[in-house]
């Protein structure tokens, strides 16, 4: 039996505890030796029961905190029920838990989900020293009345620390002196826009929160230093130290300020003071997140507003910005002439009050993202439809817009300028670099950082080329896939559709009401067909089911009835089930990718870890998820002196691996797993511990309904999931494993719909592999250190035979050194080896011409290769681009985490029905559908591992276009290599779904001299089928005499091994796995056993490597041989498939090591 033990991890005493106990939500045996009868009780009852038992046995320690939090939440929920008369919804429970935990955050939910009720009830619960800030006096009076109804002692219009104070932004600004360092318990901001827009108001809020002036100024200074020096040649150690000092000062004060909650915001902070406030509070005000749409989208090809007459009262007309204020007045008058009461929705709230009360029929406003008509109206019963007068657009002067490198690139390409030299430099820019370049170009200032200054000069040159080229154009309109360039009165403008304004504005007609989403109607009066088509395309990418229906094809009478019906008390609305969750992934990039995929997430920083809150809509199911990265493994086998290298093997055969939290030294960057508070390598106390992540995850798990663990879909990912589930189960009993093989909306939704239990067979396989690696590695490494008197010696079961291959080839290569003549025959190379230089000279002198005869020729069918597996991708990338395996894996990891390819650690060539559809879609786009031949390649269950393939039907050129149009869409920084590898994966996959090609195989006789004939068969032609996407190398040798090109170099009759050779051997001999190919070679290099040749990337053994291998193979051949390693790999696979018992395999390994190693330890000649 294997009994996993976690060091210092009991949720009560902090002692050692088994994984089984943690998964059952129990403390360790020392705290609670025996208990039964609580397995089937709910989580809250279990916590209470355990608390009482621990308390009665005088064992209560840290478990008190868990009990306190649970009971506090219960108290707050009961108070809410008593005050409101109903049970809080799942989302309200999430907010109440955060509030009760004294967290500062933004409520990013739309109106109708109980934000105001939650905040008011909690304010009354606290009872005093609460400040509730609202934008207007009328809203202040409404809030005061509601608070009084809930039973609060209210101070309306001024601050009284013994009451709940409700004030306006105006009061905050006018009473600066009286609010300095009041530091109330709880501060609510109903509408954060006034704070975000005004630096002065931010100053006042900072004072109110109790933030000392010097701490606030330090935050401002820190932001300025980061902005100034991040890309500067003056980013010295002195500047870095100053930044560290400021960060430390701010971190020490963060938990000492008032709790701040922002109920809503429509814009994000941009000013330096607002960014300082974000730094101090740990979160930024985020805009209301879109949960779902229930809207009929329509359009008409004219600007006729007479439709208002048919639709009647309850409309909002949004006028495209370029028409100006005069058009708003003109439309208002037109509507009034139709017999309706109309009012401009430009500023203030009076228009909304009148509209709500039925005094106004139609509102007229500007289609502006920041306008009150687009963001400030929430009238679910009254507002039924929105009419856009003109397609909503963003219009800017073209030459100003060209200061953005990505805009310059897109415009340049559109007008035919060759940007090939500049493209890759622009594509790899991060957001900060783009901003710095933009502002330096606009201001005409140089950049104190050579690389960016050089790029700025190049951008200025290309800007002048674009301007000159535009002057040559006779057309007044230039159209691209994502924007339009127009010429008006001699000036050029760039125009984009404003999709966000369309979404927000049309969303005014579809609001949450009585737990359901009302039906809305949106009509665009199209004034620019090109811009409308771009908008339609963008909308369909975001909401695939979106369809814009021509107004002439709609039944307005029927729509009007449906609009009215959805606003009745028991009307037909779209109802949702909202649940809250914590989604844990491995990497920060993946967390960001998933969060951005579904909505514009809000971010808060907890314990220096970003927590993304996002909304995932799946039909009528809505998930409000916190997404956090564990950063891979959180524990590893302990380095403490326990058992045999951290694993106890007991007399009854029980195996107890002890795991300790992973720590990273921030000075030497080494990683270790022990209880030590100092780095064992350099002695530094500047450490980063996984305990910080665990504490955060436990805190978040307490606040949500469910925990979803979404680590990678392999044995390592399963072990990570097991560890996380162990640490979190005492805090939330609803812990699930979710698995996906690609990061796409469809895959994430499918994973959430089908949560699973953790696969303990995969976990056991990983545990056996890790223990075996520890035992073999530590045992042999210590013997090597003794033998060779040095550090950085290591050995492993897989590494050693691989080292042996490279050592043997290196020795043979060196022993057969001589001279090599390369003869180039029209692109086909012939290699000749000579041991002596004089023979080379003789050969060259006799080689005057080469005579080529074509002996035969035949037509053959060429089959496409299967899509890539891990090994074939590494081999192809090395052969084609000479890239090392670890770099290819790093790039593939980036592409996977960006959602561009499926999981890259796979040995399957299987292609799912989803993958086949992607190939079909692409071939249809490229007019190659006749070549489509669907292949699954190998049978497998749907949802199982697939080959490496793209997740969408976009080739590398379309990907580049996407990056140009939206540089911040992906959460990775692209390089030229990312594009090369993506292109390789994409083309190989598409080719695998295409028809055979027809080739010509030709046999040639090449006569190089007397008795020196070379007979070769070469592919001389290939066409049709998959060749159209994935060309193959062909040789078309000319018949007759030619003058060959000759190159002479030192060389050997033996060939060294390349990366691709080693990976092929690992695969064929059964000792490699997708997760170990690159890592094995990388580890051999780290130990200094092998090096890679610069020009051809051959792997060469060093003298150190040769000595180590000779020692290991002579003393431990049976332990590290190919056959033994291959058998172990098979056993690990069998454990994962539940065919073998894990503890049996480990006991065999332990016996094997003891038998071979113990006698050697006593030898004097080690």
UniProtKB/Swiss-Prot annotation:
Protein name: Reverse gyrase 2
ZnF region ranges: RG C-terminal-type: 662-689
One MF annotation (Gene Ontology) recorded for this entry: reverse gyrase activity
Source organism per UniProt: Saccharolobus solfataricus (strain ATCC 35092 / DSM 1617 / JCM 11322 / P2)
InterPro entries for the chain: DEAD/DEAH_box_helicase_dom, Helicase_ATP-bd, P-loop_NTPase, Reverse_gyrase, Topo_IA_2, Topo_IA_cen, Topo_IA_cen_sub1, Topo_IA_cen_sub3
HAMAP family noted in UniProt: Reverse_gyrase (MF_01125)
Name of the encoding gene: rgy2
EC number: 5.6.2.-
Pfam families: DEAD (PF00270), Topoisom_bac (PF01131), Toprim (PF01751), zf_Rg (PF17915)
Description of how the protein assembles with itself and partners: Monomer.
Temperature dependence: Optimum temperature is 70-75 degrees Celsius, between 60 and 80 degrees Celsius high levels of positive supercoils are seen in vitro. Active at 80 degrees, much less active at 88 degrees Celsius in vitro.
């Amino acid at each position: 039996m294997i009994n996993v033990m976690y060091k210092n991890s009991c949720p009560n005493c902090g002692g050692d505890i088994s994984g089984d106990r943690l998964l059952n939500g129990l403390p360790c045996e020392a705290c609670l030796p025996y208990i039964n009868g609580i397995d089937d009780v709910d989580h809250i009852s279990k916590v209470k029961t355990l608390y009482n038992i621990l308390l009665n046995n005088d064992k209560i320690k840290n478990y008190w905190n868990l009990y306190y939090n649970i009971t506090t939440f219960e108290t707050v929920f009961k108070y809410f029920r008593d005050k409101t008369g109903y049970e809080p919804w799942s989302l309200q429970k999430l907010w109440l838990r955060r509030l009760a935990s004294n967290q500062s955050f933004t409520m990013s939910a739309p109106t109708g989900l109980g934000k105001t009720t939650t905040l008011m009830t909690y304010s009354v619960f606290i009872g005093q020293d609460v400040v509730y800030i609202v934008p207007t006096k009328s809203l202040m009076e409404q809030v005061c009345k509601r608070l009084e109804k809930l039973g609060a002692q209210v101070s309306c219009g001024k601050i009284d620390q013994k009451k709940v104070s409700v004030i306006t932004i105006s009061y905050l600004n006018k009473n600066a002196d009286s609010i300095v360092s009041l530091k109330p318990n709880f501060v609510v901001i109903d509408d954060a826009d006034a704070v975000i827009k005004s630096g002065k108001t931010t100053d006042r809020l900072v004072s109110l929160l109790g933030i000392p002036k010097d701490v606030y100024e330090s935050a401002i200074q820190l932001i300025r230093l980061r902005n100034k020096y991040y890309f500067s040649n003056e980013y010295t150690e002195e500047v870095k130290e100053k930044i560290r000092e400021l960060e430390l000062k701010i971190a020490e004060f963060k938990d000492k300020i008032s709790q701040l909650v922002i109920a809503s915001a429509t814009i994000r902070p941009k000013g330096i003071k607002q960014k300082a406030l974000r730094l101090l509070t740990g979160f930024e005000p985020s805009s209301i997140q879109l949960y779902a749409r229930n809207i009929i989208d329509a359009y008409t090809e004219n600007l006729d507003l007479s439709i208002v007459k048919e639709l009647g009262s309850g409309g909002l007309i949004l006028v495209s910005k370029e028409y100006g204020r005069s058009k708003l007045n003109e439309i208002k008058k037109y509507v009034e002439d139709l017999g309706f009461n109309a009012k401009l929705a430009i500023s203030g709230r009076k228009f909304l009050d009148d509209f709500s009360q039925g005094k106004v029929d139609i509102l007229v406003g500007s289609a502006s993202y920041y306008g009150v008509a687009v963001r400030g109206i929430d009238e679910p019963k009254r507002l039924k439809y929105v009419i856009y007068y003109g397609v909503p657009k963003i219009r800017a002067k073209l030459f100003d817009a060209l200061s953005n490198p990505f805009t310059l690139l897109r415009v340049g390409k559109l007008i035919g300028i060759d940007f090939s030299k500049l493209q890759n430099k622009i594509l790899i820019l991060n957001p900060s670099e783009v901003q710095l370049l933009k502002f330096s170009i606009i201001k005409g200032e140089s950049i104190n950082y050579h690389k960016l200054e050089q790029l700025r000069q190049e951008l200025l040159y290309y800007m002048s080329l674009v301007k000159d080229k535009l002057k040559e154009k006779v057309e007044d309109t230039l159209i691209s896939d994502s924007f339009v360039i127009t010429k008006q009165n001699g000036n050029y403008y760039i125009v984009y559709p404003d999709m966000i304004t369309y979404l927000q504005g049309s969303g005014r007609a579809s609001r949450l009401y009585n737990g359901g989403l009302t039906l809305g109607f949106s009509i665009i009066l199209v004034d620019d067909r090109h811009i409308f088509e771009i908008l339609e395309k963008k909308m369909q990418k975001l909401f695939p089911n979106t369809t814009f229906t021509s107004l002439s094809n709609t039944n307005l009478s029927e729509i009007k009835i449906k609009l009215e019906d959805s606003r009745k008390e028991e009307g037909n609305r779209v109802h949702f089930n909202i649940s809250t969750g914590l989604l844990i992934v491995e990497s920060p990039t993946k967390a960001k990718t998933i969060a951005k995929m579904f909505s514009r997430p809000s971010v808060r920083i907890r314990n220096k870890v970003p927590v993304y809150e996002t909304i995932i809509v799946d039909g009528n199911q809505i998930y409000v998820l916190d997404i956090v990265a564990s950063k891979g493994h959180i524990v590893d086998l302990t380095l403490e002196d326990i058992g045999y290298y951290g694993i106890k093997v007991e007399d009854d055969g029980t195996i107890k691996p002890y795991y300790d939290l992973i720590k990273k030294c921030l000075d030497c960057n080494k990683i270790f797993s022990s209880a030590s508070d100092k780095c064992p390598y350099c002695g530094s106390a500047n450490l980063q511990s996984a305990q910080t992540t665990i504490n955060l995850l436990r805190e978040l798990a307490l606040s949500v309904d469910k925990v979803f663990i979404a680590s990678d879909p392999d044995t390592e990912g399963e072990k990570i999931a097991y560890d996380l589930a162990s640490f979190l189960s005492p805090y939330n009993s609803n812990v699930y494993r979710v698995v996906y093989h690609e990061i796409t909306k469809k895959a994430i939704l499918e994973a959430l719909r089908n949560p699973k239990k953790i696969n303990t067979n995969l976990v056991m396989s990983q545990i056996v592999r890790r223990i075996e690696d520890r035992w073999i590695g530590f045992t042999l490494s210590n013997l090597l250190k003794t033998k060779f008197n040095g550090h950085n010696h290591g050995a492993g079961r897989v590494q050693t035979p691989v080292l042996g291959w490279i050592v043997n080839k290196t020795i043979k290569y060196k022993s057969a050194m001589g001279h090599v003549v390369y003869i180039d025959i029209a692109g086909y190379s012939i290699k000749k080896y000579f041991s002596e230089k004089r023979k080379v000279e003789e050969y060259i002198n006799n080689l005057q011409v080469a005579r080529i005869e074509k002996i035969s020729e035949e037509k053959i069918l060429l089959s496409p290769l299967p899509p890539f597996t891990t090994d074939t991708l590494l081999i192809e990338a090395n052969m084609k681009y000479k890239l090392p395996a670890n770099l290819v894996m790093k790039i593939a990891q980036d592409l996977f985490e960006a959602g561009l390819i499926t999981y890259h650690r796979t040995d399957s060539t299987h292609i799912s029905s989803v993958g086949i559809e992607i190939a079909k879609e692409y071939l249809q786009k490229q007019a190659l559908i006749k070549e489509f031949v669907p292949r699954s390649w190998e049978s497998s269950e749907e949802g199982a591992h697939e080959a490496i393939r793209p997740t969408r039907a976009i080739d590398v050129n379309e990907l580049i276009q996407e990056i140009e149009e939206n540089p911040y869409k992906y959460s990775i920084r692209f390089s030229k290599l990312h594009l090369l590898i993506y292109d390789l994966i994409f083309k190989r996959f598409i080719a695998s779904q295409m028809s055979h090609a027809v080739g010509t195989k030709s046999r040639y006789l090449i006569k190089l001299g007397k008795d020196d004939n070379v007979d070769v068969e070469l592919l001389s032609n290939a066409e049709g089928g998959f060749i159209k996407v994935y060309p193959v190398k062909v040789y078309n040798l000319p018949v007759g005499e030619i003058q060959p090109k000759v190159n002479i170099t030192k060389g050997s009759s033996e060939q060294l091994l390349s990366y691709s050779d080693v990976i092929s051997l690992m695969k064929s001999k059964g000792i490699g796995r997708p997760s170990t190919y690159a890592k094995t070679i990388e580890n051999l290099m780290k130990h200094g056993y092998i090096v890679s040749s610069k020009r051809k990337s051959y792997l060469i053994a060093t003298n150190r490597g040769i000595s180590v291998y000779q020692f290991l193979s002579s003393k431990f051949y049976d332990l590290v041989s190919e056959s033994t390693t291959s058998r172990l790999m098979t056993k690990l696979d069998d454990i994962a498939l539940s065919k073998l018992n894990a503890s049996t395999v480990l006991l065999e390994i332990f016996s094997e090591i003891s038998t071979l190693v113990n006698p050697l330890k006593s030898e004097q000649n080690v």
